[in-house]
Swiss-Prot record:
Source organism of the structure: Cupriavidus pinatubonensis (strain JMP 134 / LMG 1197) (Cupriavidus necator (strain JMP 134))
A GO CC term attached to the entry: TAT protein transport complex
Gene (name only): tatA
Keyword terms: Cell inner membrane, Cell membrane, Membrane, Protein transport, Translocation, Transmembrane, Transmembrane helix, Transport
Similarity-based family: Belongs to the TatA/E family.
Assembly and binders: The Tat system comprises two distinct complexes: a TatABC complex, containing multiple copies of TatA, TatB and TatC subunits, and a separate TatA complex, containing only TatA subunits. Substrates initially bind to the TatABC complex, which probably triggers association of the separate TatA complex to form the active translocon.
Protein name: Sec-independent protein translocase protein TatA
Function: Part of the twin-arginine translocation (Tat) system that transports large folded proteins containing a characteristic twin-arginine motif in their signal peptide across membranes. TatA could form the protein-conducting channel of the Tat system.
Disordered as annotated region, ranges: 43-73
Entry-linked InterPro entries: TatA/B/E (IPR003369), TatA/E (IPR006312)
Location(s), subcellular: Cell inner membrane
Length: 73
């Protein structure tokens, strides 16, 4: 009673297809696939944009002590 057999899942699938129809299920699948693809692309773009910003911060370090020494003179 704890797990469902393949027959239970087939019956559920048939009922869902009768209630929603195949066209609506296809549209839901396409929307879900597009959302997953957009999420993956966004994650890839986020990683690419973060890497150059980190390199930029490392290369533009300002020596604060040097500015204070020149002001005192």
């Amino acid at each position: 009673m704890g797990s469902f057999s393949i027959w239970h899942w087939l019956i559920v699938l048939v009922i869902v297809m009768l209630v929603f129809g195949t066209k609506k299920l296809r549209n839901i699948g396409q929307d879900l696939g597009g959302a997953v693809k957009g999420f993956k692309d966004g994650m890839k773009e986020g990683d690419d944009k973060a890497a150059p910003a980190k390199e930029l911060r490392d290369s533009t370090t300002i020596d604060v002590d040097a500015k204070e020494k020149t002001r005192q003179q």
